[in-house]
Every structure is written in structure tokens, then in C-alpha cells.
């Protein structure tokens, strides 16, 4: 038969001799094992092989499982698991035998288990890496700032900054207008989206004014007809005085400095009625006060050209903050407490009208003035009182009681909820305000986003509270910031230990510089770790008015982070040209973006240290050095009859305080980081909190409750503005204001009284530290 199945036929073999018997045995065997008596029938069909059915998936899985079990599981069980189990069982028996010699086996097992778990937990805590991603310091209690900053660097969203800025600067938004209402809603919505708890939207009533009717008519010598200079709503100074003047002589006064006015007075140019025509100076408030003091009936400010545009007008406030900030009609109290005073009694309001004009408009008047009188450094002449006369009308829309709003958000601290810092920025602008103040508002919103992302990502809380505030009413003599301070004076003085203002940050010039004005306690904080930055930092004392002024006046340390161009209000700030379209290309520039990212990271780093370092990072050493040096210079300005012994006794006590603090902090650092004390002992933590409490009160306790002589708004006897400030000498202009004002008028007996008062304040505040025996040192042997 033909082999059609392809298998090999077996070779012939010899058959067994006993054939019949084998057949019988074979049949019996087959029946015994259940085999069929006949072989199966194989059907041949056309000599073709049947195709095999495909193997099912479940069969493949079963075959793989069996293979894996045979080749892996069984060998591992046989060669590893079973021997290990035998070893563990043997060790357990030996261990139980050992425990039975000590006590009850079950009890001793549980004690051993607890000890082992405690050791493991301690090792995990000490490892700086916890399962939730939060990195703690080596003491098991403090956050890992490096980890937080690494995350912040990756999370800075420049596209969000651009989107926020484009919207916020898309409309004029003076306080109390519909534009401000829209921006406030946007900011509150941003707070809410970032999960920031809205601590409140504070509304205050304040003196405000808005563009109204203005007109200016010019008459040259012997001209009775004259000509009009067209004015519009851009010819407006916030806080300006209303008035109407007819046929009044005008003279040019350069920048109306004290020297300029003295020169003009010497030449008899300030006799009778006159209007001053001036270029904007560094301090508009001082120009206003100078004009009033010398008897001017009005003042007209000439704006500088912006590039080739000589038609731009800078709308600067003309309030007088050297007498105080806030609502002009409720000085030193929040508006709802008592009835407002009359506007004529308000010291911080100017008493003469003012308007700003463009360079082109100013040239029309300057062209009429003769080349006589005083010649100034810009080669312009004052002219004479007979050269030109003006009709001037200033009729702004005054609202004596109009709302301004502050928006306040908060992240609560985990350790010292009674201590806090504030990060703030102004919000309002007479125009679009892209470069200032809108960019500062956007920086504030971005900081909020970064902080809240760190809170969620790492389940993190700072040790102390942090407030984020968008101040309103800044163009109305810092009304929003001041009224908040006046409403909550005691609460803020007891809780807030630093105000950081980010409103003057910018990336618009090529200097890549940051100007930081701050209290001497904060100087070391802002100067350290600057080697790897893409920008330079210059730290100086506070020498500028702003939303921080009411807090400085009450002794709270402040820090103002500024870019030079914004700080000096360079063009196009305060003009209608300060629009998003002007700066969008700079904002999208890669290098500018890198600088902005570095600035944002710098702000996070420094604010993080302030709210999350175990110690409030105040440098008593720098503060003491500052006091000693500055007071020695102050003494040189006085005759020998003025005795400074009480003052220098105060600085000596502060030197002792410095040594005490440095000793305690050094011992604390050694205990926590050198001796391996992973958990801060409770008594040490309480003493550290006491140090923080005393540190936070240094500034507010160095104030006079009754305020400075003739300027009672200012309580701070060490830091604050003189009545007449000099931009070229910020240290003398903004330190020991009452004493320096009295030195200026050579009232030496009053200087002696004020020096003694200062000495008493320094001595008493130093003794707060020195008399606390718990803060003299740490006995590390006890821990």
C-alpha cells in the first residue's frame, strides 16, 4: 500500500514463537486497560492531507503558564524559597528560645516589633525624602527650599504673564471707574482659580478727582486778543486743586527747586501774582510745595518728549505725601470713624491749581518769554513778568467721598500664625499703565500662582502667613494702602513684619539691574547669593514715597523691588502711550524672558526665606552697624552743645543684643544641624518663636505714638522723609527725619530733646531682648 501520510514504515521484526498465547495475553491486556479491540479506521480522501485547526489563544496562554511554572516558579521555589523558609523558621525558633529566657515570648516579640518600626520611621524622616514628595530639612520639621525653588523655576509661566498683562492694560483703570471694576473682577477671579483664600475686598471712601474742564489762553506782551492752547482730558494731574485765573503773568522756573526759586527771588521775579511754568522734576510733590511757599498762583508742568513725539503728556499726581498719605479729608484715621475735614484744611492737598502740558504746548509759551532774567542750566531763561500773561481754568470732577478698593488674599502659615509678610502691588492708573503699574500687578498674580502650586504639589505650608494685596487708590496719595493701615493699625503692627512691594519691577531697559530699597534689617537677605544671577542688585535705604509709606511710617520694615526705569517713571509711564503694543516685543524676547524668569525666582527665594526660615531673616548685626555709622554722621551735623550720650548708650545696648542673638542662633544651629537632633525640642521651638516675636517688633517699637513734630502722620523716628528731601542724598533725606528737620532750622534745644527721646527708644527696645533670660543661650548637653 502506498504511504500517503509521510511517516516511515517500521522495519520487519521477528515474530514471537508462541503466537496464539501472545494474542490471548494481548487481548486480555487491551481489555484490562480499556483499549479498543479494533484499531481506528483512517479514511483516505483523494490522497490529500487535512489542514490542522489553528491553536486557540487560551491554549497558548495555558502552554506559556505551564512553561513558566516549570522553568521558573518550580526551580525558584525549590532552590530559593523553600531553603529560605527553612532558615527563617530555624531563626525564629532560635529567637523565640532567646526571648523565652527574658520573658513572655509574645510580649517580647511585640516590643521588638515596635522598636524596629520606630527605627525605620526615624530613618525615613532623616532621609529628607517622604512618599508625598515633600522634602523636609534634616531636622524633620522645616521645608527643603531647594526642592521648592527647583519646582518654581520649572513652573514660571511667561505666557500667562503676557496674557494677564494684555488684559489688565487694555483699558484705563483709575480708582472708582468701570475700568477698575473690570480689573478687580479679573484679579479676584485669578485669586479664586489659584485657590488663594480671599481674605477680603476692602472698600474705603477717599478724596478723588477726575478729568474735567480745563482751558489755557496765552497773551503776549501788548496783545489783548491772545490765542488758546487746546487742552483735553490728558491735561490732568490727579489730586490737583481747582481754580480760575485771569490775566496773570507767567515766568519759567526750570524745575522749581529751592535753588531755582532763590535765584529768581534774588532778581525780583517773584513779586506780585505769577504762574510758574516748569519742567517736571524728580519730586513733583516738592515742586508743588516750593511753588506754594514762594507765592505762585498756579503751576504748569511741561512733559518731556517721548522719542520724537512732543505731544505726549505725563499725568502725575500732585499730592503732598511729605505731610502724610491716604484720604486727604480723614488724615490719620480711617474714613468711617469720624467726619471728614474740609478740603482747605487738608495738608496733603495742594493749595494752587496745576495742569500738565506737552512739550509742543510748552514751546508755544516759552517762545513768548524773553531771554532775560535767570538763565538756567538747560539754557532757557526765566523771562520777565511783563512778557506773557495767561488765563487758566482748572475744573476737575472732584468726589470727596468715592470708593477705592484693596483686594487681599492669604496663605496661612503652619507654625506662627500670628506673624506674616505682605507682597503687594499698586493697581490703578490714569491711563493704560502697561509698564507701570499693570506689570507689577501681573508679577503679583504670577507669584500667587507659583506659591499656590507649591502648596498643592508638596502639601506644603509656610511657617508664617503670607498676604497678597492689590492696592487701589495709589494715584490718590496711596489712599487704599493707607486706609487699610489706618483701619487695622494694631492688628497689622502686631502681625506684619515685612512689606514687599513688587509694583516697580520691569524689564524694559538694557541695564538688567534691580534697585532694592529696604530697612537695614533686610539688607543682608537681599544681597546674598547673587553670583549666579542674570541681573545686578543694588540695595539702599528707602528713599521714595509709595504704597509702602504708611507702613514705613508705623515702623514696619519695607522692601521695594524696582527696575531703575520704572522707579524713575521714565517715558512712556503716566502717558497714553504706555500700552501693551509698545512692550509686547520686549516681553516676547528670549533674553528678556530669561531675565524675567530669574527675577521671579529671586522674588520667590527671598519671600520664601522671610516666611519659611525657622528664624525671621533679619540681620541685627547690619542694623546695629547702620545705627552706629549714621548716628556718628548725624552728631557731626550738630554743635558740641548737643549731647549724644543717651543715643550711643542705646547703640551699645543694641550691640549687646546683637551678640546675644548671634550666640543663641549659633547654638540653635549646632543643636539642630551639628548634633543630629532631628526633631526640634519643644522648649527650644518656643524660645525660637520668642526670638521671632521680638525680631518682628523691632521697627514698630521704635516709634513715637504722638508722631513727629508738625507731621504727626509719621511715627517712625529712625526712618522716614524729611520735609524737604534731596534725591542726591537719600540717606540724610530719609533717616532721623524729625532731628534733621530741626537741624535745618538750627533749633538746637529741640534737637537735644529729640536726641534724648531717640536714645530712650533705642535703650528700651534693646532691653526687650536683654531682659529675656530664656534667650541667653542653649545648653546643648540637655538634648
Curated annotation (Swiss-Prot):
GO terms for biological process: protein transport to vacuole involved in ubiquitin-dependent protein catabolic process via the multivesicular body sorting pathway. Its main location: membrane. The lineage of its organism: Eukaryota, Fungi, Dikarya, Ascomycota, Saccharomycotina. PANTHER family: N-ACETYLATED-ALPHA-LINKED ACIDIC DIPEPTIDASE (PTHR10404), ZINC METALLOPROTEASE TRE2-RELATED (PTHR10404:SF72). Residues 128-783 are extracellular. Glycans are attached at residues 139, 213, 529. One of its GO terms (molecular function) is carboxypeptidase activity. Residues 1-109 are cytoplasmic. Pfam families: TFR_dimer (PF04253). Residues 1-22 are annotated as: Disordered. The chain crosses the membrane at residues 110-127. Residues 241-333 form the PA domain. It is found in: Cell membrane. GO terms for cellular component: fungal-type vacuole; plasma membrane. This is Uncharacterized protein TRE1. Gene3D superfamilies: 3.50.30.30, Transferrin receptor-like, dimerisation domain, Zn peptidases.
